Amino acid sequence: MSKQTLVLLYGGRSAEREVSVLSAESVMRAVNYDKFLVKTYFITQMGQFIKTQQFSEKPSESERLMTNETIELTQKIKPSDIYEEGAVVFPVLHGPMGEDGSIQGFLEVLRMPYIGTNVMSSSIAMDKITTKRVLESIGIPQVAYTVYIDGQDLEACLVETLARLTFPIFVKPANMGSSVGISKAQTKVELRKAIQLALTYDSRVLIEQGVVAREIEVGLLGNDKVKSTLPGEVIKDVDFYDYQAKYVDNKITMAIPADVDQSIVTEMRSYAEVAFKALGGCGLSRCDFFLTQDGQVYLNELNTMPGFTQWSMYPLLWENMGLAYPDLIEELVTLAQEIFDQRESHLI
């Protein structure tokens, strides 16, 4: 039986490229090599596509994907050279130019099936401000927030924010993930600095009310019919779950399933599925919630390309539901082909 080609795209132009490499390495080890041939392409910070490795069997534990330190620019290709008839692309890319609709649009132009959500839902979910406004419109609870757009009157924004929110306040670039560029402010001076930091990553800044809450996450899988997981909890031993804590210091543990009341589980899974459909989601997403001590649920964000490292919540949530990592990848490939066929049928 001939193997299907799975094209892994990793690296990318955003500040989350290191997470992308970790995720892609976990995927390449989890693939069922009885069914798939894996071809990998590294995208540099400048947007160059580099042809790297090919795997017909599971790589050794010591083998690593090629990155900036090991690639050769002689392997640079035209982006369109990744095209291969019958192949499915797994764009294991995080952040801007990865999960914001850009690469998804490129792959649709190439007429290649790809894992993950489509152009529209990727771009909406990537922007935290737009996501909040969409979810508010369908009655899904959000924590209080204000918005600052680069070029607006910063002093007026500070006045509005301090009138509506109380410290602590979290400041986030609208279009970044993995906690990149996020700050916690306890004073007006810190708030101003936090906005300036966020502006180095994006021109749109979300300013959000800090809440004392547990962080609960739900996995989503499907196209027209979406399935959700039991929730898992991120248990922190740091005050703020930032990039350093997530990926460098590993100062987190996870409780899967989360220890929450059944009524809360039902509410979160319902909100997650409704939000996924409202944003036009397909393939997969991870839905992140805040759960306060008095039982209030807030939907924080939808992550359309969650981390796929061996310690990432998304694959572990599905493993808890009885879907092992290799089978999850296979299901994602099937969903990618299904949505591709549907999209193509609408163009004829």
Swiss-Prot record:
List of residues binding Mg(2+) 1: D288, E301
GO CC terms of this entry: cytosol
Main location: cytoplasm
GO biological process, one term: cell wall organization
Positions contributing to ATP binding: 162-217
Pathway as given in its UniProt record: Cell wall biogenesis; peptidoglycan biosynthesis
Pfam families recorded: Dala_Dala_lig_C (PF07478), Dala_Dala_lig_N (PF01820)
Positions with a binding annotation for Mg(2+) 2: E301, N303
InterPro entries cross-referenced by the UniProt entry: ATP-grasp, ATP_grasp_subdomain_1, D-Ala_lig_Van_CS, D_ala_D_ala, Dala_Dala_lig_C, Dala_Dala_lig_N, PreATP-grasp_dom_sf
Cofactor(s) demanded: Mg(2+); Mn(2+)
Domain annotation ATP-grasp: ranges: 132-334
Molecular functions per Gene Ontology: ATP binding; D-alanine-D-alanine ligase activity; metal ion binding
Cofactor note: Binds 2 magnesium or manganese ions per subunit.
Keywords in alphabetical order: ATP-binding, Cell shape, Cell wall biogenesis/degradation, Cytoplasm, Ligase, Magnesium, Manganese, Metal-binding, Nucleotide-binding, Peptidoglycan synthesis
Protein EC: 6.3.2.4
Coiled coil spans: none
Subcellular localization: Cytoplasm
Catalytic reaction annotation: 2 D-alanine + ATP = D-alanyl-D-alanine + ADP + phosphate + H(+)
HAMAP family per record: Dala_Dala_lig
Family: Belongs to the D-alanine--D-alanine ligase family.
Protein purpose: Cell wall formation.
PANTHER family noted in UniProt: D-ALANINE--D-ALANINE LIGASE, D-ALANINE--D-ALANINE LIGASE A
NCBIfam families per record: D_ala_D_alaTIGR, PRK01966.1-4, PRK01966.1-5
Name of the protein this chain belongs to: D-alanine--D-alanine ligase
Organism, scientific name: Streptococcus pyogenes serotype M3 (strain ATCC BAA-595 / MGAS315)
